[in-house]
């Protein structure tokens, strides 16, 4: 099962400034897009669908909407 990736405006702005945005999107699709509860992600504040993971050198805070198969990235922090 594959999840659609969506980026909220703050995360989308950060993504637009990343050097290798296309590779980052591809890695997001490969990892969190196929298993949003995997890839060593952790629940934030005991909310199962509010998660954090490190993907392709960036910290990603996202929500999982299982009913519509969507992962929404709300914050994206590229590591130096």
Language-model segments: which ranges?
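Basic, Lys/Arg-enriched alpha-helical interface segments
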Residues: 1-59, 63-80
